[in-house]
């Protein structure tokens, strides 16, 4: 049996994504909900769980900041991805809630900022660990408002005050991408399928045009960059007078593809300072493109 950890409590969007990812696994699975993304990452690293599911990217709010850093720090591998449509609703325990406090995950509050401004601009917004935790809190306290999925609100016995209240951008549906992570690579290369690979680059050199050099390597090897994220460096980088940065590149292709391998080798050569045997490029995993 494979144990899969994820952010709880039950009835979160992460829980829904976890169930969908678990259906792809041939072995029997047990799903365990934990209190934080840190707990999920550590549970896998410490062999308390075989795999974990973590929210990675929302198409309105962008990167879930701690996700990639936790994968990097705990030396985990991304083995799968699930894209989930996010449709947020507002629930309450009573009808008298015009100035009630609004509870939800910080990302959900941000994704509903326009609707909240129009209808509850004077209400205090209080962050919770998840959307389901917000629904649970309002149900137990019998006061306040919760932003969560309609399913979660109904399961906690709350009335729907507003449905599909998320911000709209160009009329597009909001999605969140979730990663399935493990201790080892688990996505075999199949030439008939399309993959994405996440690459972490920590330059131990600095010069004008450094980021352009990185992107030139992927272009030279005919690889398409889907996303690039800049974060404070997690490794000890001794570049005097600068705040060291690292880059996460999500690239179309599999880690075992010949073009990808040549690109990784080139990046390691160009980003590594002369005379120092240190890691500058790490492949965080390959996974099927949704």
What are these regions, as identified by a protein language model?
Residues 1-290:
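Domain-level signature for soluble enzymes in the chorismate/prephenate branch of the shikimate pathway
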């Amino acid at each position: 049996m494979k144990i899969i950890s994820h952010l709880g409590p039950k009835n979160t969007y992460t829980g829904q994504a976890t169930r969908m990812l678990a259906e792809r696994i041939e072995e029997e699975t047990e799903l365990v909900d934990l209190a934080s993304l840190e707990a999920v990452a550590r549970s896998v690293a410490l062999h308390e769980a075989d795999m974990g599911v973590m929210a990675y990217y929302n198409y309105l709010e962008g990167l879930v900041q701690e996700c990639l850093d936790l994968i990097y720090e705990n030396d985990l591998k991304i083995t799968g991805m699930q894209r989930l449509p996010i449709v947020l609703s507002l629930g309450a325990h009573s009808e008298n809630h015009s100035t009630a406090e609004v509870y939800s995950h910080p990302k959900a509050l941000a994704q509903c900022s326009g609707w909240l401004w129009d209808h509850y601009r004077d209400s205090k917004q209080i962050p919770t660990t998840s959307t389901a935790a917000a629904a649970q809190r309002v149900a137990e306290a019998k006061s306040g408002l919760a932003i969560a999925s309609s399913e979660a609100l109904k399961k906690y016995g709350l009335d729907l005050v507003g449905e599909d209240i998320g911000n709209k951008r160009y009329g597009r549906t909001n999605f969140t991408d979730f990663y399935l992570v493990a201790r080892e690579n688990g996505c075999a290369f199949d030439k008939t399928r399309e993959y994405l690979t996440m690459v972490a680059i920590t330059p131990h050199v600095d010069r004008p045009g450094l980021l352009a050099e990185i992107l030139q390597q992927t272009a030279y090897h005919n690889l398409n960059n889907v996303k690039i994220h800049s974060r404070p460096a997690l490794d000890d980088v001794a570049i005097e007078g600068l705040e060291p940065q690292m880059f996460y590149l999500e690239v179309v292709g599999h880690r075992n593809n010949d073009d990808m391998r040549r690109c990784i080798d080139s990046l390691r050569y160009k980003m590594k300072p002369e005379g120092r045997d240190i890691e500058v490029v790490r492949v965080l995993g390959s996974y099927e493109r949704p």
